[in-house]
Amino acid sequence: VDLLVDDPDTKSILLFLEAVRDGDKLAAAARRAYDAGKPVLAYKLGRSEAGRELALSHSGAIAGPAKAADAFFQANAIARLEMLEGLLEASPLFIGHPPPKGKRVAVVTTTGGGAASVADRLGMLGATLVPAPESVRTALREHGLEIGRGPLVDLTMAGTREGVYGAALENLLAADEIDAVVTVVGSSGQFKPELAVAPIVEKAAGSSKPVAAFIAPQADKSLALLQEAGIANFRTPEACADALMAFLNRRAPRPVLHHVEPLHEVDDALRDVAHRAHRALRAAANGLQLDIRLH
């Protein structure tokens, strides 16, 4: 990681981790990366007992309890992804964007079904879905469009008219009550890729807030255009939501108050506590049996 922090061509750092062998070293490198403006994203095995056993058998290291890993990543500004696909697609969300103030997301779309699949997953993961602010509604009225007040900014097919999608996205990105925006494009992404993604490319460029694009059904040409423009684009709603939540959960590194224990040492400590508790319970049970016999 240290080498990548110093590499001028590296913009973000992706980690596939079976275990963390040296917590101090990784923490220091991740903090250097944060100071250099290079986000560190991680996918780590070990959420389940089976995953921890696989990591142990393959690497010979202790994978560590999931909560300890989460706390370690959070303290050192390492964004943890739950899906490998999300890890590979998420970098543009983080590059050039500081940690957000909250977890407030607007979902703007021309296809209700595709947007609902992302919004549902975001809600399950803890995001707050923000309806269209009045500034967005006013801008859309100028284009002859009145939208509902639900959790989706649903432009319907009217969003394919010139200027409509761009007006909505521009005002959503400018709204103080929104931390990130998901753009969902429907079938126009397949048949008119340049027109479908043009307003996203135009309005997302230079924004201080990230934009996550999901196109349903999949449209490879549109995805390629977004990729070329440096905009995060996703092939599934699950990966889109996973990546965006990793961004929303990220915070600046916490102050170092004491020695950061490697995860395998944390795991050893927890195991020792469990053994001592087990011995205490056995001793208490034996004492109870003796007391019963005496009476």
Locate each region found by the language model.
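Catalytic-core regions of core metabolic enzymes
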Residues: V1-L263, D267, R271-H278, A285-G287, ...
